[in-house]
Amino acid sequence: MAELIQKKLQGEVEKYQQLQKDLSKSMSGRQKLEAQLTENNIVKEELALLDGSNVVFKLLGPVLVKQELGEARATVGKRLDYITAEIKRYESQLRDLERQSEQQRETLAQLQQEFQRAQAAKAGASGKA
């Protein structure tokens, strides 16, 4: 009985460890998006300071290409919208993973108690024999 519970406990621990890896990966992805959001907000602020007489370039591969100011502002705005939506998606994913992780912790605690009871019962049975 104790061996069966131990195997089940080991499987649940592996699930928990995978959830923790996924959680860490999602947090890392969200942090990268936050950095991109900050960077793009700075670009948006800089573009707001320009007027029609200024020349704007964008980097395409190794080449700088002239770009209309309005087009540059629109591109940055769309990028900000996309990044914001991705951050919301990551936050939702993080909430789900945290909820699953908490449930997994509870499952592990229950299995650990079962295992300890089984070990105690086994020790009691072998002590009587």
Curated annotation (Swiss-Prot):
GO MF terms listed in the record are:
protein-folding chaperone binding; unfolded protein binding
Q: Where is this cross-link: Glycyl lysine isopeptide (Lys-Gly) (interchain with G-Cter in SUMO2)?
A: K66
Instruction: Provide the cross-link position: Glycyl lysine isopeptide (Lys-Gly) (interchain with G-Cter in SUMO1).
Output: K66
Q: Which InterPro entries match?
A: PFD_beta-like, Prefoldin
Q: Which residues carry this modification: N6-acetyllysine?
A: K21, K66
What Pfam families does the annotation carry?
Prefoldin_2
Please indicate if the UniProt record lists Transit peptide as a keyword: no
The UniProt entry's GO biological process terms, in alphabetical order, are: chaperone-mediated protein complex assembly; protein folding
Keyword annotations for this protein? Answer: Acetylation, Chaperone, Isopeptide bond, Ubl conjugation
Q: Which GO terms describe its cellular component?
A: cytoplasm; prefoldin complex
Record PTM N-acetylalanine, positions in chain: A2
- Function comment: Binds specifically to cytosolic chaperonin (c-CPN) and transfers target proteins to it. Binds to nascent polypeptide chain and promotes folding in an environment in which there are many competing pathways for nonnative proteins.
What interactions and quaternary structure are annotated? Heterohexamer of two PFD-alpha type and four PFD-beta type subunits. Component of the PAQosome complex which is responsible for the biogenesis of several protein complexes and which consists of R2TP complex members RUVBL1, RUVBL2, RPAP3 and PIH1D1, URI complex members PFDN2, PFDN6, PDRG1, UXT and URI1 as well as ASDURF, POLR2E and DNAAF10/WDR92.
Q: Which PANTHER family match?
A: PREFOLDIN SUBUNIT 6
Family named by the database record: Belongs to the prefoldin subunit beta family.
How is this protein named in the record? Prefoldin subunit 6
Taxonomic lineage is: Eukaryota, Metazoa, Chordata, Craniata, Vertebrata
